[in-house]
Amino acid sequence: MKNDKVSVGIVSDGTFLLDGGAVFGLVPKTLWERNMKPDRRNRVRLGLNCMLIRTLNANILVDTGIGSKEPEITKEFYGHSSSKLATNLRKEGISAKDIDYVVLTHLHFEKCGGATKMDREGNIIPSFPKAKYVIQKDAWNEAFNPNEWAVPKYSNAVKHLKVIEERDQLQLIEGNTEIVPGVEAVVLDGPSIGHMIVTVKAGGE
């Protein structure tokens, strides 16, 4: 989508591997493997696609991929050797400091891992120093107080988000919320409590 008021595009953090059974659930393997061949560990390769929305007054990044600070054992397990988000943003003429809002649709590691990074001293810091991080309050509460069934869905990536709160970059919202004119966060059933999508309207589109 692109017009004189807004542009919307995909910016990739690369790919990762996830267990095919976890991805397709009740769908029999004999059906899904026709289109997605698993590796020897039954993992299928998925894209880590983030969305970049550019309006006349704001740059908005939707989700951040896995990021670069996961331990080597985790990178190997998920087949994600390095983060490509910053490089691909630069290809779009955007630096981390240019991002005004980071919208995290939910807080599983493959969506929020790149929200923070490690500096040269080993400290966890926000990846986007000037951005407000927009998160549903229900998603935040669930991530930091998960029930026993939800614990495996979250990782250190969530704990690292505390630094965003400490630096006053956290913007918790409740329900459908307009981020900037024409760009709205909309709560929608998904993989976790407080999951949301982002809608963009401009020029009659």
Descriptions of predicted regions:
Residues 65-67, 108, 139, 191-193:
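Catalytic metal-binding/acid-base residues of hydrolase active sites
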Residues 80-94, 98-110, 120, 127-187:
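Metallo-beta-lactamase
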Residues 1-7:
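Basic/polar N-terminal segments that are highly enriched at the extreme N-terminus
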Residues 6, 13-92, 197-205:
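Conserved beta-strand hairpin/beta-sheet module of binuclear metal-dependent hydrolase folds
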Residues 112-116, 184-196:
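Active-site glycine- and acidic-residue-rich loops that bind
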Residues 36-41, 121-122, 185-186:
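Short, P/G- and charge-enriched loop/turn segments at secondary-structure junctions
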Residues 78, 112-123:
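Metal-dependent catalytic neighborhoods of phosphoester/phosphodiester hydrolases
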